[in-house]
């Protein structure tokens, strides 16, 4: 696996962990984080000039981190979030055909 991919995996899990902590400290709600992530995805997909020139695989790739964080946010447990491999699988299962 490419080292950059491993770095991004670690970064996404760090952000998911911070989001989890923000929710459990009562600073943000799951819904507030979900709304922010939905806005981020809409911003990415709304840039038609860039987005329309991409292949479907590249579109999925650019949205993958946001979707993974959305799933991690909505799958929060009391203390932990699911492991990266499980979250990535869940992103793949929600992908439109």
Please place each PLM-identified region on the residue numbering:
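Low-complexity intrinsically disordered segments
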Residues: 37-97
